[in-house]
Amino acid sequence: MVFGVFLLIILFVFIIILMVHVKKTDAVVFSDVLSCSYREKVSVDRFIRKLDGTLLDNYWVDTSTVGKKKLEIQYKNRYGFIEQKKFEIEVKDVVAPIIVVNNPYTVVEGEVSDLLDVIFCADDYDDGVKCVISGEYDLNRIGQYHLKIEAQDKSGNEAEKEFTLNVVKKEKKSNSSQVKYTDFKDFYQKYNDSSVEIGLDISKWQGEVDYAKIANEGVSFVMLKVGGQTEIGGEYIVDPSFDDNIEGALENGLKVGVYFYSYAKSEIEAKKQARWVVQKVKDYELALPIAFDWENWARYSTFGIGFRTLNKVAESFIEEVKRYHYEGILYSSKYYLENIWHQDDYVKWLAYYNEYNEIEDDYFLWQVCNDGKINGINGSVDIDILKVR
């Protein structure tokens, strides 16, 4: 009996000594550099230099915002005990603002009031990035001016570009050039197979559409402009041809989706636009998504927002239409989808006027050209390819 008690005491003391030893042992050594970049894909083990044990959850770190981040790891040490360690990292904005300006850059005499309004200058993270043009110039006087534009974000990242500004006289438009079209019949024969469908996107600019004729030509779907915003902060206007277009399309058995042309610069405004669209389409059957069409790149600087805010705007629109059980997609051209938009989780509608190929498999819809010619529409129309899902 006494011997048994003695053994228990010895065992208890051994466990206490072991636990103290474990606590004193520096089982985790963190990296010397506890930082990463904004939107960098990094897992928590990136910040561990040495671990005397097994990491239980090597999770992805949230790098969607800049600043200090408190993290915690859970691991099993070499003695089998589960331990936790807290530490702090910093997510940094290390990317300079983007300046896009042709060299030379040409404007028509008297047509631009502020040069900074028409030069693309923005930051990946910060709103209201500071852009400055140095050098003398006169937008109301014909001539050449050698200038430099500089930009700096709140993290101190800088960018600059030198360019020549050409202020020129307005020229009369020539009507001598012959308009070229992409014949829909040729396009259909070239690309139609069991993996895709061929369709059009249509707005008031196509005038009165004969949907029976375009359906007979092989069109299986249309993306219709439901409406758009008039300007930054402007009202929402229904496309004048929308009702006729959607009724004509549905009556002739075409699949229908819609798009909204937006000037939104906040999440609140984007959600409001999404609800407006839902109200306009709720009495119709949509087989295809609602697209968010934001393409105000020529005067992007006037919006005063960074790409992070712009992406939140698109995300808000798409998520809001989802709340009403519609699918939301993002429409944009190839350059902006690859360089500005970060919407990896969303379905995309690509505008890219090139030969269609299956390599571009990240896209659900592909607007292949804007000069289509088809029986049933006077003038040109955009032709699209839809992947069969």
Model regions and ranges:
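Catalytic domains of cell-wall/extracellular-matrix polysaccharide-remodeling enzymes
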Residues: 286-359
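Solvent-exposed, low-complexity, repeat-rich "mucin-like" stalks and linkers
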Residues: 18-52, 95-127
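Functionally critical loop-and-helix segments that line ligand-binding/catalytic clefts
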Residues: 174-199, 343-389
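Substrate-binding cleft of extracellular glycoside hydrolase catalytic domains
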Residues: 192, 196-210, 215-217, 223-312, ...
